[in-house]
């Protein structure tokens, strides 16, 4: 009789950073996400200077925004976004870019970590904003939470739109490619049997 182990082997898609295709990118991504929250929550306990805690938290939020937008999104899920401004008209529009699904395989673990963290972090900041309002704490703390909300929600909305755009363009490409192949094949077969 075989003895079954109590610890099953980790499967791709489990929340285990060792299964990541890009473990360093994933750990840096999660590190920036959690360090800003931890500095906001516990910074005053370790650093007595409020201004220093505010500045460090703000720098961690900016680093998280930059790293997620320019590095983690591209490496972990193959998505990237940016905002372009037309100099002549002053209009701005968002540009979304995704890797080709036929040439790049996204690891299920990376995808789960990315999307879970992307949606959980703004929810945590919303909870902290509600607590700051209820406690009637300093306006400066509330302003820091507002900045955190703006940065995290911007990335969340942009990557959600980018993912939707990516799925739609993949569907359109498959339909277009399939339609072209069917038209060519139908045309050739039609000519052969005329």
UniProtKB/Swiss-Prot annotation:
Give the encoding gene's name.
tvp23
Organism encoding this protein: Aspergillus oryzae (strain ATCC 42149 / RIB 40)
Decide whether keyword Transmembrane helix is in the record: yes
One Pfam annotation reads DUF846
A GO cellular component entry from the record: Golgi membrane
**Keyword Protein transport annotated:** no
Q: What is this protein called?
A: Golgi apparatus membrane protein tvp23
Membrane-protein topology: Multi-pass membrane protein
Keywords from the named record: Golgi apparatus, Membrane, Transmembrane, Transmembrane helix
- Membrane-spanning regions, if any? 19-39, 41-61, 114-134, 139-159
Q: Which InterPro entries does the entry mention? A: TVP23-like
Q: Give the UniProt family note.
A: Belongs to the TVP23 family.
GO terms (BP aspect): protein secretion; vesicle-mediated transport
